[in-house]
Structures are given as C-alpha cells and as structure tokens.
C-alpha cells in the first residue's frame, strides 16, 4: 500500500500530540532524542521499537550512544511524512514511557 505524503495542517495536528519531537524546516521529517537511565534501557527501547517498526514495515533512522537514542522519521518513498511516521513515533513514545522516559 502506497502511503501518501501528509499535508502541513495534518502534520501540525499530529505534532501537537507528540511532546519533544521536532519538525524539520521542510516538514519532511520529525526527530527526537530519547535519554534513558543506562545502555540496557536504551537498547531495550530500541528492541521494542524495532519489533514495532518491522510490524509496520517502516524503519527509523537512528543513532545510539550509551543511554541516548537519536531518532529521525520520514517516508522516503513519499518524499516526506506519512501516517506511518506518526504511528511509529507514538509506538516509540509508549516504549520510552515503559522505561520511565
């Protein structure tokens, strides 16, 4: 199923429900840095997020150093943000919350 790029108004409405996420200037990606208590918590978050990403068939761009995980989401095929990006961001928020973040 081809995902359609979201309109700016829809993106802004979705962003209102995502604390700490930043929208890039072109409104083509969102990003957030998650900070955990330690590496084990960060890796647990990444594992849970990876399982959800596989189920969605939508994969993040991310970078991990010790307790920090930097995440950027967009849909390359659509040339911007789609519903999948916000589904994955919300799943990541739940995974982080389970770890006290």
UniProtKB/Swiss-Prot annotation:
Gene3D superfamilies assigned to the protein according to its UniProt record, in alphabetical order? Transcriptional coactivator/pterin dehydratase (3.30.1360.20)
- Keyword annotations: Lyase
The record's annotation in InterPro entries points to: PCD_sf, Pterin_deHydtase
Q: Name one Pfam family in it.
A: Pterin_4a
Enzyme Commission code: 4.2.1.96
Q: Which GO terms describe its biological process?
A: tetrahydrobiopterin biosynthetic process
GO function terms (MF aspect): 4-alpha-hydroxytetrahydrobiopterin dehydratase activity
Enzyme class comes to: lyase
Entry coiled-coil feature ranges: none
Its UniProt entry gives the catalysed reaction(s) as: (4aS,6R)-4a-hydroxy-L-erythro-5,6,7,8-tetrahydrobiopterin = (6R)-L-erythro-6,7-dihydrobiopterin + H2O
Q: Which family does it belong to?
A: Belongs to the pterin-4-alpha-carbinolamine dehydratase family.
For this entry, the protein name equals: Putative pterin-4-alpha-carbinolamine dehydratase
């Amino acid at each position: 199923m081809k995902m359609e790029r979201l309109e700016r108004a829809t993106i802004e409405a979705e962003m209102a429900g995502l604390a700490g996420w930043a929208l890039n200037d072109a409104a083509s990606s969102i990003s957030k840095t998650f900070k955990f208590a330690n590496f084990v918590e960060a890796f647990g978050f990444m594992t849970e997020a990876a399982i959800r990403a596989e189920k969605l068939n939508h994969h993040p761009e991310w970078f991990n150093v010790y307790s920090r995980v930097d995440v950027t989401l967009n849909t390359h095929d659509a040339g911007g943000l789609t519903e999948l990006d916000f589904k994955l961001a919300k799943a990541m928020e739940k995974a982080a919350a389970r770890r006290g973040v």
